[in-house]
Amino acid sequence: MEIGLSLGANMEDRLKYLIQAKQQILALPGINLAAQSPVYETEPVDVPPEFQNIPFLNSVLIIETLISIHQLMRFFLFIEQKIGRVPTPVSNAPRPVDIDIIYADKLQIEEDHITIPHPRWPLRRFVVQPLSDVRPELQIPGQSVTVSHILTQLQDPSRVVLLTKTW
């Protein structure tokens, strides 16, 4: 099963945290890397005003696995916590790393704590740009057009600047 992951970081050594997350994801048995996007520096989106001046680094990983979505979610939460993310009552507060599942093949899941595809992915340039780099012709369930087409029509004016192609 092909899974698209969005990785983000906006605390301290952001690139180091993205690299650690990638390494820990790929160290899990049964996970293979199919593609990775460049890393972009991006403006914060949907964060409280006091965090508006803290830019993110964002990227996308495409993995192949037979591991269940629920097990993957547990793995990713463990990795986030291991890298230093702590629960906070403040929504979208700064974090060392955030790992979100954008899509999982053609699956559509809507449960208490899991919605796949991610409901806000097509609205966020910090997800759509790196996803378009690695899967431009992909049509994710719930969308009638490709990722690259969504990018050309995106209304999100936030800044997305290439930081590095290799990481």
Regions found by a protein language model. Name each.
Residues V45-F56, I67-M73, F78-W167:
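Flexible, gly/pro- and Lys/Arg-enriched active-site loops
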Residues L61:
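Short basic (Lys/Arg) and small-residue
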Residues M1-I31, Q36-P44:
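N-terminal beta1-alpha1 ligand-phosphate binding loop
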